[in-house]
């Protein structure tokens, strides 16, 4: 009898201990921070200018992966953030970019536009309707039966909504015309604390007095990105034109504005205060001012990283005060791309040229008319993709596969074209690494019939967006950092897939990974 009682007591103590251990290992708050255009090489290059609270703390106390990889092409804000929080690629989540060509209407579609919902403090109608799979936010809301506090705060609309997913309780971004924090009726009522902030402390009350100049003595900025040395710099936002808020969102002050709202949020909600895990997704900006190149703003990009270092330190201190870093899991990563560099100076004689997709489409249509007779065989084009007229091809009883193959054979003869792929080859062709990344970048609802691969060093001229993009195969190094509850500090240079982020965070929170995430959680990350 005594033995049975003793056994029962031991079992009870063990189970209680395991439950306590499991509870302590589940963070009360998860903070996901995606920093637009953050580069691992710049983190290292400017390290002599950092303080102790930001990057240096992350490198000392966090688990740092210096070479994270996105498994698809044409990265931008929407596609990168969607990939982080769905744990998959555009092939499954449907988000191929900030905008794309709709195959049915032949019109440009923005990734978060939705006329069915009204904007709050904005005229933009917004929802995540184009996001085809579940996100980390969605799975947490399902797992907690809606009890979790799930919110998203970002300078831009796309990053806020893609991180918030379908089921979050709110997503907020800076209105590019008014500077107010905005939202959408899709996520329900607008929180009073955001409205109060807009009415009392909104950016529009302060922007005319803000001036961005060097944070450190100008002699500290020694990283050379231009042949013309800068003496100093000064940018203000006092003009009355509508683009002053757009420019502000490309300055380091945009990150401080995010922190200001995070402070209000943590003060006015119960996030991280109970045993139900909560999720706060944030975004910063680390690209060039006004999306210019490093050759124009060499000193600014260095100062931006110095200020980003301070802003990160402020965020870590804020979370520690309000929730406790021991109760919080933080993951930080990048969107994995940079604004296009200008073409190389001609005096260096690096092979280059210009590829005009509009001219390519016109020549292809003339060729197809010569082969198959009169008709508009090319419906439209976008970026490096060409959309064929399926209805005409069917009416003429032509073989679509043959038309695609002939088109590829013709296009690949053009100057600056390295290869051309039909959609059928991308989806059904023999596997190789290039085909795999193209397939991951493909979406049946919006991708073209032909994808044109342009030679590195050549500039793609886009008539739709009035832009010029120099093709570079080498993407900037993408950092991935985990910090906080149960994380084992270490610096690793082994490549890891960004698709593993969502399953890893889901594992920490003890919930399902998003429904299209097939990668395994990262191993060795726990203490």
Predicted regions and their residues:
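His/Asp/Glu-rich, glycine-adjacent segments
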Residues: 89, 97-276, 285-292, 413-415
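Secreted, luminal/periplasmic, and some membrane-associated catalytic domains
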Residues: 76, 98-123, 133, 138, ...
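Second-shell loop/turn segments in exported
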Residues: 39-45, 68-71, 121-128, 245-252, ...
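Short, structured active-site-proximal loop/turn typified by the sulfatase FGly-forming signature C/S-X-P-X-R
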Residues: 43-92, 149-153
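Substrate-binding rim/cap in mid-to-C-terminal beta-strand-loop elements of soluble/periplasmic
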Residues: 359-398, 467-509, 523-527
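Beta-strand elements within well-structured catalytic alpha/beta cores of enzymes
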Residues: 27-39, 58, 84, 140, ...
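Bacterial Sec-dependent N-terminal signal peptides
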Residues: 1-26
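A long, amphipathic alpha-helix that forms part
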Residues: 249-274, 287-328, 406
């Amino acid at each position: 009898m005594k033995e049975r009682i003793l056994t029962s007591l031991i079992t009870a103590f063990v189970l209680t201990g395991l439950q306590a251990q499991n509870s302590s290992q589940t963070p009360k708050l998860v903070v996901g921070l995606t920093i637009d255009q953050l580069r691992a090489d710049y983190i290292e290059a400017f390290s002599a200018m950092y303080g102790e609270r930001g990057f240096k703390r992350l490198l000392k106390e966090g688990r740092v992966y210096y070479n994270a990889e996105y498994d698809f092409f044409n990265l931008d804000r929407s596609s990168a953030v969607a990939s982080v929080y769905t744990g998959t690629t555009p092939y499954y989540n449907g988000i191929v970019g900030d905008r794309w060509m709709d195959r049915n209407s032949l019109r440009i579609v923005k990734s978060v536009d939705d006329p069915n919902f009204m904007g709050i403090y904005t005229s933009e109608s917004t929802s995540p309707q184009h996001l085809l799979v579940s996100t980390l936010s969605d799975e947490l809301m399902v797992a907690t039966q809606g009890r979790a506090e799930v919110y998203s705060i970002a300078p831009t609309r796309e990053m806020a909504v893609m991180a918030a997913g379908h089921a979050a309780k709110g997503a907020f971004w800076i209105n590019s015309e008014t500077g107010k924090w905005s939202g959408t009726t899709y996520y329900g009522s607008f929180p009073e604390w955001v409205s109060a902030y807009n009415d009392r402390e909104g950016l529009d009350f302060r922007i005319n007095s803000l001036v961005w100049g060097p944070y450190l003595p100008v002699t500290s900025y020694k990283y050379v990105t231009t042949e013309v040395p800068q003496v100093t710099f000064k940018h203000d936002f006092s003009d009355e034109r509508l683009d002053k808020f757009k420019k502000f969102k490309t300055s380091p002050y945009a990150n401080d504005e995010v922190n200001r709202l995070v402070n209000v949020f943590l003060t006015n909600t119960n996030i991280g205060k109970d045993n139900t895990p909560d999720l706060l997704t944030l975004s910063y900006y680390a690209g060039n001012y006004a999306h210019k190149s490093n050759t124009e703003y060499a000193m600014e990009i260095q100062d931006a990283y110095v200020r980003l270092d301070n802003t990160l330190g402020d965020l870590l201190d804020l979370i520690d005060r309000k929730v406790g870093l021991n109760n919080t899991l933080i993951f930080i990563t990048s969107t994995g791309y940079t604004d296009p560099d200008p073409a190389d100076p001609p005096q260096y004689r690096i092979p280059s040229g210009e590829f005009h997709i509009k001219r390519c489409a016109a020549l292809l249509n003339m060729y197809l008319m010569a082969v198959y007779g009169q008709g508009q065989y090319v419906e439209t084009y976008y970026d490096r993709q060409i959309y064929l007229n399926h209805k005409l091809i069917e009416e003429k009883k032509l073989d679509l596969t043959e038309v695609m193959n002939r088109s590829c054979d013709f296009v690949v003869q053009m100057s600056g074209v390295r290869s051309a792929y039909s959609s059928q080859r991308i989806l059904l062709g023999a596997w190789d690494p290039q085909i795999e990344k193209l397939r991951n970048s493909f979406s049946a609802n919006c991708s073209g019939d032909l994808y044109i691969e342009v030679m590195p060093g050549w500039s793609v001229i886009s008539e739709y967006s009035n832009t010029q993009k120099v093709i570079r195969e080498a993407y900037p190094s993408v950092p991935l950092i985990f910090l906080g509850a149960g994380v084992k500090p270490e610096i690793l240079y082994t490549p890891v897939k960004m698709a593993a982020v969502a399953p890893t965070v889901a594992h920490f929170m003890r919930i399902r990974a998003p429904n299209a995430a097939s990668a395994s959680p990262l191993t060795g990350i726990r203490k």
